Each structure stands twice: as structure tokens, then as C-alpha cells.
Swiss-Prot record:
Family the entry assigns: Belongs to the FMO family.
Record-given protein name: Flavin-containing monooxygenase FMO GS-OX-like 9
Enzyme class: oxidoreductase
Residues reported to bind FAD: 20-25
Species of the source: Arabidopsis thaliana (Mouse-ear cress)
Residues binding NADP(+), per UniProt: 222-227
Chain's role: Catalyzes the conversion of methylthioalkyl glucosinolates of any chain length into methylsulfinylalkyl glucosinolates.
Superkingdom classification of source: Eukaryota
UniProt entry keywords in alphabetical sequence: FAD, Flavoprotein, Monooxygenase, NADP, Oxidoreductase
Gene3D superfamilies in the record: FAD/NAD(P)-binding domain
Molecular function terms from GO: flavin adenine dinucleotide binding; N,N-dimethylaniline monooxygenase activity; NADP binding
Disulfide-bond pairs as recorded: none
Length: 460
């Protein structure tokens, strides 16, 4: 186990609550403790991993993942991982800066391993750095709100409930870091007839295995990676799989899959759902379906957070957040890790965690609230001018932004090999959707990665 000797003075040490023990929460806990802060991590599951802690039993969850009838708007099941899920990026690019995601004998050694292997990596990480001692498992956060200020010092009330005993605990913290992820609460489309359609409708949040759909006619809504993966799995058992996409301008990789499987058909978006089971598409074609499976993504939700309107989720735009991390009017005592999407997650979470920890200890400072708000407004305008829908505000897909962010804390830029391996996997998936995880042509890049200090320093 690695231990840390902090140089931060005790007067700078803060009592910090981290909500969530997934990839973002774990690295946040580590970086906060490095800076001398006293850290408590609250995790609703019985182990680390967040999304990567697989939950096979979804019988008690609403099929569409609606949380309206649950306590405090929470879901019963956090993870949306399905049984066969494999990583869409090679393991070499996914590790934290000082803890590479190595293949280990006796485990899943593939470059694109299954979800269990990433969960085991996170367990290894938490054990290597002694993080478990900071985590309270089976504890769900029900309320986070400001405490009345004393001497102009902002503090936070955190109320949580133990899963089995039902015991409620209320604590005061100097700061709260929200690291709850954003792949749990389904984002559902609005389709005419959806509420009255009598046949089976589920969201991919509760999809686990293909067997329940054997010999069915299934309509899969959404052409994302999960929509494609699940469709390719369903064609082996379902009578027909009809994939409904926003555009019929599909990748050559998906086109190859469709030509290979005569029971997999592509359609445009859905116009309406009819009482007799018909699913009518916008081009006038239709099919009578047994099941509609929505692979339509997820929404940001923080049902426990009472911010008095200073942090809001508007069509999946969480804001205002300076650099997707600090709410200007509540910083630095409230922060978020893991909001951005479509980037190499673990190194970015690590950079966020370092920045938050340093700001709380006084090693780094933030602009004024007005300056941060101005920066957020400028970012929103740039997204609007680029034609980016509001619900894609946090889809970054930009290595330059990641490098700029790292400069806030002197965190190393993403290595060239990491960027190129990411792009190589993405391009390969576009061309060879069924085989890209097991067949690739980036061997020279792979060797460059394995000979880099990211791997050699760790192995030495």
C-alpha cells in the first residue's frame, strides 16, 4: 500500500465529503488526502467501482428507469453495465497517470477487456493507495445543502442513510465533491403513443442479457455504441432486430454488420407507436414489435443537491460550472468531478481532482466568481455558434481542451501515443464494428506506449 506524507499545513486542511467511489470519486479521494485533507467517501454500493460494479439483478427497477416513484428521485440500480460489455478503448490509454491498466495473468488480458477487468483495476487502485479506509459503503446520500454561514465560512450539511439499518446520519463538511457519474438516469425520447403502448418497453439501463428477447421482434432505438453492441448481440437470439437511428448515414462498420445479418434492419426515427403493436417510422415504413429497447443515453441528475437554484440541470447542461468543475457562486467548497463526456476519462478525472485538492489547500486559486461566470457564458456562446445542442454541452471530444485543463495544476499533457491510440481505436470501430476489439493494426503505437515512462516507471 502506498502512503503519503503531506506538506499541507493543518490550518489549510479541510474536512471533505466525496460522493461516489467510482473512477472519479476514488482518484478525488486520493488527491484530496495527498493535500492533507480529511476525506470521507460515501458510496451507495457495497464495493468500489461506480458504474463498473456490475449489478445483474434489475427486477426491482422500473423497465424505463423512471425514478419518479422512488425515494428522493433515486434509482434502485446504479449501474447500467450489461453482461457482455467490453471496453471501447484499449486498456493502455485508460489508466491513471501513475497506475497503468496492466494485463494480469489469470485475469482478462485482452486489450479491450470485459467490464469486470476494469472493476478489478479500480479495486487494485483503491487497495494500492489505501483508499478503502476512507469509504463508507452501503450509504446513500439524501441531502446536500449549505449550512448557515458563520464568520463568512461556508460549510455543507450532508445527510445520508445506511442501506441496511436505515440509520440516518447528518454531518458538517467544509467541502463536498460530487462524483456520482452520469450513466444511470435514462434519457428517454418523446414519441407519440409511447405512454399508451401496451407491449414491452425498456431502457438499456436495465438490459443485461439477450435471452429474454429470444424469438422476439425488437426495435432498438439509438445508434450509439451501446445501441450497436446490443443490436449485434440480439441478432443471435431475436427473430428480427430493427435499429432506429437519427440518420441513415451510417458507418461502414455498421453497414458490414447489417449486410451480414439478414434479421438486422436499419430504419429512420420513429413517428408513432400504435395500440396494435405497430411501430411506425418517419418514412412510413412500419413493423409490429414485441419490445422496444431504448439505447438513448443518460441524463445528469443530482437529486440530493439543494443549491437554491445556483446549480441547475437544463436539458443536460449542468451549470453554471467553471471548466465543468466549479460552480462560481459556490466554489471552491462545492465541486464536480466527471461531468465531461467523450474524452479519455481517467486522466481527466485525475487532473480535476488535483485541481480541486490544490484549490482547497490554498496552493491554487480560482478567478473571481464574476470572471468564472463570464468564462462560462463565453463557453456557452461558443457551443451555440458551433451548432452544438444544449444537451451535448459537456461532450468535449477535444485533446486540446484536456491539455489546457491540465495546465491549471501542472498536470502532464496527454501523451501523443495515448491520443493516437484513442483515435486508432475509434477509426477501427468505424470500419470494423464487429471485430475492432480483437483485430487491430496499431502495433507500432502499442509498442511506443509500452516503452513509455507511464509503463516502464511503474514496472521498475
Amino acid at each position: 500500500m502506498v502512503t503519503f506524507t503531506s506538506e499541507a499545513s493543518r490550518s489549510r486542511s479541510k474536512k471533505v465529503c466525496v460522493i461516489g467511489a467510482g473512477p472519479a470519486g476514488l482518484v478525488s479521494a486520493r488527491e484530496l488526502r495527498k493535500e492533507g485533507h480529511k476525506v470521507v467517501v460515501l458510496e451507495q454500493n457495497e464495493d468500489v467501482g461506480g458504474q463498473w460494479f456490475y449489478q445483474p439483478n434489475v427486477e426491482e427497477e422500473d423497465p424505463l428507469g423512471r425514478s419518479s416513484g422512488s425515494i428522493n428521485g433515486e434509482l434502485k440500480v446504479h449501474s447500467s453495465i450489461y453482461s457482455s460489455l467490453r471496453l471501447t478503448s484499449p486498456r493502455e490509454i485508460m489508466g491513471y497517470s501513475d497506475f497503468p491498466f496492466l494485463a494480469k495473468k489469470g485475469r482478462d488480458m485482452r486489450r479491450f477487456p470485459g467490464h469486470k477487468e476494469l472493476w478489478l483495476y479500480l479495486k487494485d487502485f483503491s487497495e494500492a493507495f489505501g483508499l478503502r479506509e476512507m469509504i463508507r459503503f452501503n450509504v446513500r446520500v439524501e441531502f446536500v445543502g449549505e449550512k448557515e454561514e458563520e464568520d463568512d465560512v461556508k460549510k455543507w450539511i450532508v445527510r445520508s442513510r445506511e442501506k441496511f439499518s436505515g440509520k440516518v446520519m447528518e454531518e458538517i463538511f467544509d467541502a463536498v465533491v460530487v462524483a456520482t457519474g452520469h450513466y444511470s438516469h435514462p434519457r428517454l425520447p418523446s414519441i407519440k403513443g409511447m405512454d399508451s403502448w401496451k407491449r414491452k418497453q425498456i431502457h438499456s439501463h436495465v438490459y443485461r442479457v439477450p435471452d429474454p428477447f429470444r424469438n422476439e421482434v425488437v426495435v432498438v432505438v439509438g445508434n450509439s455504441m451501446s445501441g450497436q453492441d446490443i443490436s449485434m448481440e440480439l441478432v443471435e437470439v431475436a427473430k428480427e432486430v430493427h435499429l432506429s437511428a437519427k440518420t441513415l448515414d451510417i458507418s461502414s462498420g455498421l453497414s458490414k454488420v447489417i449486410s451480414k445479418h439478414p434479421n438486422l434492419l436499419i430504419h429512420p426515427q420513429i413517428e408513432s407507436l400504435e395500440d396494435d403493436g405497430k411501430v411506425i417510422f418517419v418514412d412510413g415504413s412500419w413493423v409490429v414489435a414485441d419490445t422496444i429497447l431504448y439505447c438513448t443515453g443518460y441524463s445528469y441528475k443530482f437529486p440530493f443537491l439543494e443549491s437554491k437554484g445556483r446549480i441547475e440541470v437544463d436539458d443536460d447542461r449542468v451549470g453554471p460550472l467553471f471548466e465543468h468543475t466549479f460552480p462560481p457562486c459556490l466554489s471552491p467548497s462545492l465541486s464536480f468531478v466527471g461531468i465531461p463526456r467523450k474524452l479519455i476519462g481517467f486522466p481527466f478525472f485525475e487532473a480535476q481532482a488535483k485541481w480541486i485538492a490544490q484549490v482547497l489547500s490554498g496552493k491554487s486559486s480560482l478567478p473571481s466568481p464574476d470572471q468564472m461566470l463570464q468564462s462560462v457564458d463565453e463557453f456557452y456562446r461558443s457551443r451555440d455558434l458551433a451548432g452544438v445542442p444544449k444537451h451535448n454541452t459537456h461532450d468535449i471530444a477535444d485533446f486540446t481542451y484536456c491539455d489546457k485543463y491540465a495546465d491549471y495544476v501542472g498536470f502532464p499533457h496527454l501523451e501523443d501515443w495515448r491520443k493516437l491510440l484513442c483515435l486508432s481505436a475509434l477509426n477501427n470501430s468505424q470500419e470494423n464494428l464487429e471485430t475492432y476489439r480483437d483485430s487491430w493494426d496499431d502495433h507500432e503505437l502499442l509498442q511506443e506506449a509500452l516503452q513509455s515512462s507511464h509503463f516502464t516507471n511503474f514496472n521498475s
